[in-house]
Amino acid sequence: MKKIAIGIDFAKEKFDVTVKNVTNGTSCYAQYPNTPGGGRSMVHLVKKFAKGITSEDWLFCGEDTGYYSQTIARYLTEKGFFIWLQNPYAIKHSEGDIRRGKDDKADSAAIADYAHRYEDKAHKYELPSKAAEELHMLLTRRDALVRAKRVIQSGTKEIPKRDKQGETITLIKASTKRLIKDIDDEIDILEQQMEKVVEQEEALQKSYKILRSFIGIGIVNAMCFIAYTDNFKKFELNARKIATYWGVAPFGEDSGTSVHKTPRVSHFCNHWLKAILSNAANNAIVWNPTIKSYYERLVKAGKCEGICRNNVKNKIIQIITAMIRKGEKFDSEFKFTDQNTPESMMYPQARDCW
């Protein structure tokens, strides 16, 4: 059991930290800037407080808040410390006691208590590869441009029909056209940079070519799978785990004699990735003979549209995961099941789920 539990509450410009000695119950609190220098100051505080307890008995824990938690997590990992980034929802709903009000100091103390209580569930944070981080930034920037383009286009559509003539309207339309062209050019530059990042590593290049061989998977979906799975290392090539993160894996509820709920997808997922995958599914249904045949079988079996399309998304994840595992490109005769995929990880072909 770790003797020192360190709870970190991350924010944009600072972080609050509570250091707790679980043996005697003493603790201390401090606040530092969310920078590598702040991380260094925190380590000095822990060393002073621990009084001879080695770093092997320290457990850093914080909420996985995405960008805000990355700076300190990276610093501690590079220095060889054990830091556990946990889902904020899990920490919040583990407290038991009813808390009224909120402040950063209390939050960091609650995280330290959580780290001590659930130490057996702790898993060490692993730094994503440099390529995965770069792809993630490029994808985020591309999405921002796509959203901006959508806003500009929708503004033009709002012009009443009676006002679509005249010098002012002509100027607005010309301006909109120029902006959209500029955005499209920037999107092309970002996509070219993504391909350059992938080309720098042979393993990434191989995965990218395999993913693009699947009819329906374009550059954005291929880059998403590589970036968010760190080239499929993050989820251990487990199709079920990937589908869960993408928000298309069904989960049911079964308890006693009265609770028997139809499996449905959870809203705890990355909704943007799910939307991007929906685009791939729509394309595959039209152009991919394997997926088209599968989709038509579901429709013929009487499944509703939502169930059919969600199963298609699951099928795509199963197939591309098997393709990556085998190192094979897609063709119409590709078989996605193999001995390395246990039956418990596979989805029923026509499961009633959303």
What residue ranges belong to the model's regions?
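Gly/Thr-rich phosphate-binding beta-strand-loop-beta motif of the actin/hexokinase/Hsp70
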Residues: 2-21, 111
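Short, glycine/acidic-enriched loop or turn micro-motifs at the edges of active sites
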Residues: 12, 66, 90
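Short, solvent-exposed helix-loop connector elements
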Residues: 49-50, 124-137, 164, 168, ...
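Long, charge-rich intrinsically disordered scaffolds of nucleic-acid metabolism proteins
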Residues: 84-210, 214
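Phosphate-backbone recognition surface of nucleic-acid-processing proteins
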Residues: 213, 219, 223-301, 305, ...
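Acidic, metal-coordinating catalytic cores used for nucleic-acid/nucleotide bond scission
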Residues: 58-71, 99
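Nucleic-acid-processing active sites and adjacent nucleic-acid-binding tracks
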Residues: 24-59
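Low-complexity, acidic/Ser/Thr- and charged residue-rich accessory regions of DNA metabolism proteins
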Residues: 257-258, 295-354
